[in-house]
Amino acid sequence: RLAEQVQPDVVITEVGGTVGDIESLPFLEAIRQLRKDLGRENVCYIHVSLVPFISGSEELKTKPTQHSVKELRSIGIQPDFIVCRSDRPIDAGIRRKIALFCDVDPKAVVSAEDAPSIYEVPLTLHEQGLDAMVIERLELECGELEIEEWRTFVEHRRTLSRSVNIALVGKYVALPDAYLSVNEALDHAGIFHDHKVSVHWLDAESLSPEEVESRLKALHGILVPGGFGVRG
């Protein structure tokens, strides 16, 4: 429906979860049928898989990736590209092994190691040519990539010299992702004003009236996001 109404060049659809879980099966079946309906040249599958490092043997293990791709292939989905999530670089030997057992080209195995900022990930993927390979795979006609503005933004964010301390007082601070959009908004505002924002998470339920001043007076600002109930 989106493709018919907006008529975009590309629609990106994420299917989360774990391959093999019953919850994701209807969605995986839907994207399998999508390639059949739209044609192979119009659909590209990119599989993001964890490649864990085992400290005992000091090696990266490819079995989880091999297993998840095997599960995908069993329901009729062959990934075109595999993005390997890891806390360290994926060397050429590991890439060749994954390519061999997952039946993809070695160039189609891309490393996505942990980065200091999520905004650095597109640059990492670009340096390995993932964007160019996807464009070629979908037979799209594109002009020259303009990535310098993004690169400048990332470098600017990395080199912020001034800082500001903001208290985020909330009910769900034990799970910071509950305030992910708020945290990102603070980060963006700080970048715009050339400041690195340090967020100090404070549990609203444990903050008593007697200690409010002592815990907050050293900070530059206070943000209390919306919540539910009288505890906020």
What residue spans do the PLM features occupy?
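N-terminal beta1-alpha1 cap of cysteine-dependent amidohydrolase-like domains
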Residues: 1-9, 17-232
